[in-house]
Amino acid sequence: MQSATMEFDTIAAISTPPGEGAISIVRLSGEQAVAIANKVYRSGTKDLAKVPTHTIHYGHIVDPQNDQLIDEVMLSVMRAPKTFTREDVVEINCHGGIVVVNQLLQLLLREGARMAEPGEFTKRAFLNGRMDLSQAEAVMDLIRAKTDKAMNVALNQLDGNLSTLIRSLRQEILNTLAQVEVNIDYPEYDDVEELTTKLLLEKAEFVKAQIQQLLTTAKQGKILREGLSTAIIGRPNVGKSSLLNHLLREEKAIVTDIAGTTRDVIEEYVNVRGVPLKLIDTAGIRETEDIVERIGVERSRKALADSDLILLVLNQSEELTEEDRQLLEATKGLKRVILLNKMDLPTKLDPNELQELVPAEEILSVSVLSNTGLDQLEAKIADLFFGGQTGEKDATYISNTRHIALLDQAALSLQEVINGIEAGMPVDLVQIDMTRCWDYLGEIVGDSVQDELITQLFSQFCLGK
C-alpha cells in the first residue's frame, strides 16, 4: 500500500497509446505539477505560475541542464479543484512517436515528478471525492467498450445513475435503522415492538425487491461489458471461417476447400446490432491423426463448453453426416442458432430429417458467399439475448462482477432479516443483518471498502488514466 506522502505527490505519465501518431499527451497531476512544467517550458517570458486556469499555451520543451530542445508543444494548465483529479493538472501535447514522448516524460521525472502507477489519476479522482468507486470503475469500462451500447452503459454509470440508486437504498436502510434505534431506546408504548418489526419487514422487502430488479439486468450488462462468447462450430469445410470473415468484414481465417485448414481456435470481437460478440472460429470437431489438428479439435471442444451462444453451421448442399448429427446432439439444450449454409447451391440435405432432430427450433438458411440471410442471423442473435433491445441509453445495467456479488450478498442479508422477523427473533439481532446489507451496498460506491481492494481495482487500469 502507498504511503500518505506517495499518494499525494506529483505524478506523471503518458496518457496516449504508445507508437507513431500525430499527437501524444503527457499528463502531470499534483501540487507541484505547474512548477515542474515551468522548469522545462519556454515561451518568451511567459510564466506558467501566473497564467489563468484552464488555458492552453504554445511553446517549447527544453532541458534546463543544457538548453537542448526536446519538442514544440501545446501545454494546458488546469488548477484545482476543477480538474479530473481535483489537483493541479498539466497536460503537454507533443508530437507523437516513441522517442520524443519518452524524452519528455523522463525530463519531468528528473525535475521532481514520480512515475504514475496504473490508474493512479483516476484513483486520485476517487480519493479526492470527484467520483465514487462505481464511477471510477466505469472509466475503465468506457475505455474498453466494444460497441456503442456498451459505451452507453458505461457513460450511464460514470454519470452517477447507479451511484444515485445505491445511495438512495442505503438511505432507506439508514432511516429504518435510526427509527428502530429510537423505538428500542424509548419503549413507552406497548405496541412499539410490533411497530418496529413491521417497519423492518416492510423496508427489507422493499429494498430487496429493488436489488433483485437491478440484478435482473446483470446478464445483459455482463454481455455488453465483456462480450458474448460465441462459438462457430460445424464439421470441416461447411463455411465456418467464411462466416467469421463476413461478420468481421475482413479476412481473418483461411478459407479453402481443404478440410482441417483451421488448425486452432480463432478469437475476434465483432459488433452485432450493439451486442459485442467474442467470436470463436473453432477447428472442425472430428477424429484426426494430425497431432497439430488434434490439439485444435480439443480446444474447440473446450470453447464449445464455455460458450454463451453457438452458431452451428450445416451444409445444405450435402446430406447430413454422422458428424452433423453428433454436433446437433452435443449442443442440444444450449443457446444455439442452426444455420444451413450454401443455400445458393442445389439442396441435398433432407429437411424432414433435420426437423425430426430439432423439432422446436427455427433454422436459418443462408449463403455466406452471396451474403444472403445474414441480416436475419444478426437479428436473431440480438433477439435471443435482449429481445431485440440492447443497452438503452438511459437504462441502468449491472455489468461489473464485483457489483453483482455485493448485490447478491445484500439481498441475502435482507432475506435473513425477513426470516428472522418471521421466526420471532429479537429486533436487536435482526437489525444486524440490515446493517450488513447497508455495508455491502456501501462497498459498491466505495463508502466502506478496504485500502487493499482500492489498490487492486485501480491497478487494472492503464498507465496515464
UniProtKB/Swiss-Prot annotation:
Keywords, alphabetical: Cytoplasm, GTP-binding, Hydrolase, Magnesium, Metal-binding, Nucleotide-binding, Potassium, tRNA processing
GO cellular component labels: cytosol
Protein name: tRNA modification GTPase MnmE
Binding sites annotated in the UniProt record for Mg(2+): 241, 262
Main location: cytoplasm
Gene3D superfamilies per UniProt: P-loop containing nucleotide triphosphate hydrolases, Probable tRNA modification gtpase trme, domain 1, tRNA modification GTPase MnmE domain 2
Entry's EC annotation: 3.6.-.-
Cofactor binding note from Swiss-Prot or TrEMBL: Binds 1 potassium ion per subunit.
Ligand binding (GTP): 237-242, 256-262, 281-284
Organism: Enterococcus faecalis (strain ATCC 700802 / V583)
